[in-house]
Structure formats: structure tokens, C-alpha cells
Amino acid sequence: MPNMEPTTKEIKEQKIYQEMGLTDSEYELVCSILGREPNYTETGLFSVMWSEHCSYKNSKPVLRKFPTEGKQVLQGPGEGAGIVDIGDGLGVAFKVESHNHPSYVEPYQGAATGVGGIIRDVFSMGARPIAMLNSLRFGELDTPHAKYLVSEVVAGIAGYGNSIGIPTVGGEIQFDPCYTKNPLVNAMCVGLIEAKDIQKGQAKGIGNPVMYVGAKTGRDGIHGATFASVEFSEEGEQQRSAVQVGDPFMEKLLLEACLDVIRDHSDILVGIQDMGAAGLVSSSSEMASKAGAGLELIMDDVPQRELHMTPYEMLLSESQERMLLCVKKGHVEEIQALFERYGLEAVVIGQVTDDKMYKIIHHGEVVANVPVDALAEDAPVYHKPSKEPTRYQAFQEEEAFVPAMDDVVGVWKELLAQPTIASKRHIYEQYDYQVRTDTAVVPGSDAAIVRVRGTEKAIAMTTDCNSRYLYLDPEVGGAIAVAEAARNIVCSGGKPLAITDGLNFGNPEKPEIFWEIEKAADGISAACLELDTPVISGNVSLYNETDGTGIYPTPVIGMVGLVEDLAHITTQDFKNSGDVIFLIGETKAEYSGSELQKLQQGKISGRAPELDLVTEKKYQQLLLTAIQEGLVASSHDLAEGGFGVALAEATFKAGLGAEVEVPFALNQLFSESQSRFLVSVKPENEAAFAQLMELEKVYRLGVVTEDDTIRVKHKEDQVTAKTTELRSIWEGAIPCLLK
């Protein structure tokens, strides 16, 4: 079949490079690097490797702000996943990844392959994946298309995760109109590793073979990385060919085979990397560049599942379930035999060279020959113009929103029926969260907890981000996202260790959007420094706009913490009647960006809630100490819907009630002030708990009751609600909306 690719002249004169994602200045830079005009394959290589998705060319200046080091960090940013030390020679590898654009176009496969990709990132480090989490954003559930997106995305996550046998143990979902045509699907994978097994994605050692393992290469996902680096349009729905198709059963075999190699053949394994965004070109050029080496690849040897594939297609394909290995000379047959045992193909497709060039050969001809660092390291970096949006100052000066609270119980019920607050049981029951039998705290509490086999330890994990706060004030909102994630870990009995961040923003070419990115990074960095949770991995997803309409700034924070002793595991639900209820933290009239403001005004505006990081850290440390000393029966972070929602949620599981007198007016029941915790304590531990908290803003509110009634009093005012009625509304909202 004749190759009808455009000539170098046509690429230049017809500006075909623009269609591939390169700007005029970038194309000129490529010509300057090569000392000639690139051919079609070379133009394709640069277009994907210099896309935002692969090069972070627009976000690098911002990413440099993040603190990435700490005594607990075994592997920081730059590899497949970050790793933290949990003692006993063990580490936890974790990372979050987005699959936003593909999930709008083809929600089932988009979500499924997002799960598959992040799992490969984690096991490529040498870690066994032990848990999945997700962070999802959708528009309001008031159209058939919105309901379809939710159902298909959840089915895709469940279909892949359940089939591969990794429990999906936690996550979060927010519903807002800005996500109607820009849904966000962020998947996080957590793995366990022996520190001695940590791998690098590198190809070094002159003459060492590079091996392709896993599924054959097809034409799916070509230019997927570029697709993820441009603004969306309605026509974008036609870009289904840029969405990959996943096979979880193939991935399960690949996972076991790769861990087998890492565990038992580490002496002959030089490096290993997932073929993710930008496929073979990305993994191979990055592995060579990191090692300061070159690479020669023979395209004829790449396993192909379609006829007449060109080098361009093979290099850029994002077919799933593929890995690239660099092994020591003389051990190819050993590796092939191992993969054969799993029914997988392992093929030599090239070798490491010493010239730092990336040479591609097809049918005996050199079809691409470019400096490897130019592809993998030297993409141009842009510091985009930044401008404060006019809305920001207007929000700062706006008169504070005062909610209508004539019918407190009526508002309470309405809030519990909002899908962002309502029970997500209908969603998470589609996930297998008990497979592997190590899940100690299942979805529905503040953080998920997975036991570490052979120890008394457990790993706490969560994903968090309230993007409404970031829309009001990205710096404060970014800090709150980290603080809330840490609160959830602490409430569960864990010490926060580190974060992975999924930075989802609109079009960075717009100065107002780049300002949001910069400010959010400032807030995240400040919180990470104060709470000692360095950023050890992450992902950037920009251009989340459709037809000019963008999302709220949504930097998803995935956090992992260590529960030192299984006895410290704590959940949000009240345990026994008679237990004493405490509130840690101060409640103010803060409704801007709240679920209540959205409910009553149909929009959000005003000043974001205040956050004092020093106070936040102090309260977290005190609460964790109380939990570790065995003084706490239950613990719950106050988030969306404030005290009223947290109190109701704490009663639901055991069908208990509560009788409390609060130190704030009842119209502040649903304020979303930060740095607050709802805690219950056994009567015999009350004195010790109160003594520990002695000098702080900690309030004894009342007791857990046997009946299913919640009574809340402030001075002369009192409201009463039935737990069973509130729970019925809370549990029924999402199934009803999805009908």
C-alpha cells in the first residue's frame, strides 16, 4: 500500500503542522533544531511530545512552585508515580491522572482507559496496586445527556476496576453547570512496594535491547495527547478515533508479568515504562532521555493488529495495555519465556545507542532521526500572561450573602437532596470495593482505609477539591483543597504524608485562566508546606473548555496518610448513645461558595471562607493525638453543608439521634467555615479529651441519643428533625435524579 504522507514542502506551505498541534514558531524551532524541515513522521513526533499533555509547556513555571521534598519522600515527580516511605522497608506509590476529553466523547471507554493508564503508571514503578479512587465532575442531573454521562463513566470505571481485581475504595463527585460539556474524570491509583523494588523509566547501557510487551498496536488513540491539549468544540464529539479501547483482562496479565520481572529478575531489568499518552514515542524517548542515551527503533518489529500501519501511526498510537522494557544484553529469551507464561508477547523493537539521537527505521529506511532530548526535554516553555479576572475584586467587595432560614428543617432536607451532598451509595455500590479483602473502611466515610498485610498498619486515602471556593478565590480555594484532604485523613486516624495533584483548568491562553492556575498553585504550595505534605506526583489537564465556556478551577488533591495502628482507625458515624459530642473549630457566617448559596441563589459569589493554616495544623495535630490515645469514638470533617449536614451524616449509619446545644445561631447551621471537626467521645474519655483540647475553641455540644431524633438548640431557638426522614432524602436523591 503506497504511503501518501505529505512531503516536507507540503507540510510547510500548507501549514499541516498547525493541524497536528504545532504553532508557527514551534515549527520554526523544530527546523532550527534539525537544521532542515521535518518530514511527516518527525512533525508528528514533535507535535505530540510538545503538546501540553506531554511537555507541560504552559504549566512548568507553575509546577516549579510546589514543594516536592520531605524525609518521607522516596520518589518525587518525574517518574510514573510518586512514592512515600511508611517504614518497615515499605513504600506507597500513588498518582492521579485525568481522562477528561475522552470521557466526554466516549464516556465508558474514556473512563475505563483512564483507570487502566493510572494502574500501569503505578505498577511500572514496581508497586502492586491495592486501591483505586476517583474524582468526578458533571453538570446538573437535569438532562438525559448528563444522566447518560454519569451512568457510562461510572460503568467504565467499575467495568475496568472490577475486572482487574483492584478495589475502588473512595472518591468524590460534584455537580455544577460549568461541567455540563466539560466533565472531569480523574482516577487515582495507590500501590504498595518494597523500597528495594523501586524502578525507573530509563533506557541505558549501549546495545541493551528495548522490548515491547503487551497488546498489539492499532490505530486507536492516535493524537490522543494532542486532543487533550486543545479546547473542545461540539465538533470534537466526532474525534472518537482519539479515544482508546481498554481490555482489563489483558492488563491483569500484564500487571502480574511485569511485577514478576521486577520481583524475580531485577538484575536483568534496566528500566520499565507504561506506553500512555503519546504511546511508543513518549515512553521510548523519555526513557532514553532520562538515561542520557539515544535509541534506535525498528518499526517493522512492532506487533501490529491492523494492516499497513505507518511509522507515524505506530509511534503515536495510544493503544492500551502496552509496556516498554529495557533489559540487559543476552537476557531477551529469559524475558520472552516469562511473558509467554502469561500468554503475552515480548518483542525486541530496538536498542540503546550512545549518540543521543532518536532514530526510527522502517523497511530498512530511516524515517525519523531527531535529537532525543529535543523531543523529551526541550519543548519550549511558555510563561503565559496572567491577569486577575474582574469578578475577583467584585467578589471581594460584595456584601455577604445571608440565607433565608425561616424553615431550618426544610432547608436541611433540601441540602441533603442536593446531589453533591447526597449519598453516593448508588454510585459506589457499582464498584467492587472489597476485592483483595484488605479494605478496612469502605466508601462513605471521610477517607478510605486499606490494611497493609503482614503489619498492624493501614493506608488512609482520599480525593478532595471544592472548585466553587477556587472560582471565588483560587489561592484560598487551593489551600482549602489540601487542608480538607488532610482533615479527612486525620479524621480517619491517619497522619497525612503527601499529595498527588490533578490540575484541571480551562484555556491557559486566556490571561484570567492562567492567573487562576498560578494562584491555585500558590495556595496548594502554602498548605503543603504548612501541613508537611509534599507534592510527589500529578497531572495537568488544561483546555477544559467547550465553545469558549470553561470549568471552575479544579485542582483535585489526592492524599495518602499512614494509620500507625489498626486500633486507630476511626469513622464518621456515631457509635453509641450516651457518647459526648464535641465541635472543634469556630463557626462564622460564611456562605459564599456554599451549597446553601447555590441552592438559594442559583449561583455562587462573594468571598471564599477564611482559612488559617496555622490553626488548621494545630487542630489536626490535636485531633490525631486524641485518636491515637484512644479517646475518640467518631470523627467527621465539616465540609459541604457545614455542621447540619455533618451532624445528620454522623447519625445515619447506626440510626441514632443527637441532642446538642450549639455556640452559634441556628441560621449558621449550614455555614461552611473551615478547620472544623465533629467528634464523639465515650463518657469515660470525656475528661481526658477535654484536657487535651483545653485551650482551644472546642465546644461540648451534647450527647448521642438512642432515638432517631436530632435536636439542635441555640439559646431559646430549637429545631428537631427525624434521622430516618433525613436519611431517606439523602439516600434517595441520586437514584431518583438518575432515573
Curated annotation (Swiss-Prot):
Record keywords, A-Z: ATP-binding, Cytoplasm, Ligase, Magnesium, Metal-binding, Nucleotide-binding, Purine biosynthesis
Catalytic activity: N(2)-formyl-N(1)-(5-phospho-beta-D-ribosyl)glycinamide + L-glutamine + ATP + H2O = 2-formamido-N(1)-(5-O-phospho-beta-D-ribosyl)acetamidine + L-glutamate + ADP + phosphate + H(+)
Binding site for substrate: S98, H99, N100, H101, R120, Q244, E318, S319, Q320, S541
Keyword Cytoplasm annotated: yes
GO molecular function: ATP binding; magnesium ion binding; phosphoribosylformylglycinamidine synthase activity
Subcellular location: Cytoplasm
GO annotation terms (biological process): 'de novo' IMP biosynthetic process; purine nucleotide biosynthetic process
A single Gene Ontology CC term: cytoplasm
EC number: 6.3.5.3
Binding-site residues for ATP, renumbered to this chain: Y56, K95, D501, G538
Record bears the keyword Lyase: no
Binding positions for Mg(2+) 2 per the UniProt entry: D121, D274
Main location group: cytoplasm
InterPro entries reported in the protein's UniProt record: PRibForGlyAmidine_synth_PurL (IPR010074), PurL_linker (IPR041609), PurM-like_C_dom (IPR010918), PurM-like_C_sf (IPR036676), PurM-like_N (IPR016188), PurM-like_N_sf (IPR036921)
Active site: H53, H99
One matching Pfam family: AIRS
Binding of Mg(2+) 1, residues: E97, N539
UniProt pathway annotation: Purine metabolism; IMP biosynthesis via de novo pathway; 5-amino-1-(5-phospho-D-ribosyl)imidazole from N(2)-formyl-N(1)-(5-phospho-D-ribosyl)glycinamide: step 1/2
Biological role: Part of the phosphoribosylformylglycinamidine synthase complex involved in the purines biosynthetic pathway. Catalyzes the ATP-dependent conversion of formylglycinamide ribonucleotide (FGAR) and glutamine to yield formylglycinamidine ribonucleotide (FGAM) and glutamate. The FGAM synthase complex is composed of three subunits. PurQ produces an ammonia molecule by converting glutamine to glutamate. PurL transfers the ammonia molecule to FGAR to form FGAM in an ATP-dependent manner.
PANTHER family associated with the record: PHOSPHORIBOSYLFORMYLGLYCINAMIDINE SYNTHASE SUBUNIT PURL (PTHR43555:SF1)
Oligomer and partners: Monomer. Part of the FGAM synthase complex composed of 1 PurL, 1 PurQ and 2 PurS subunits.
Family assignment from sequence similarity: Belongs to the FGAMS family.
Protein name: Phosphoribosylformylglycinamidine synthase subunit PurL
Native source species: Listeria monocytogenes serovar 1/2a (strain ATCC BAA-679 / EGD-e)
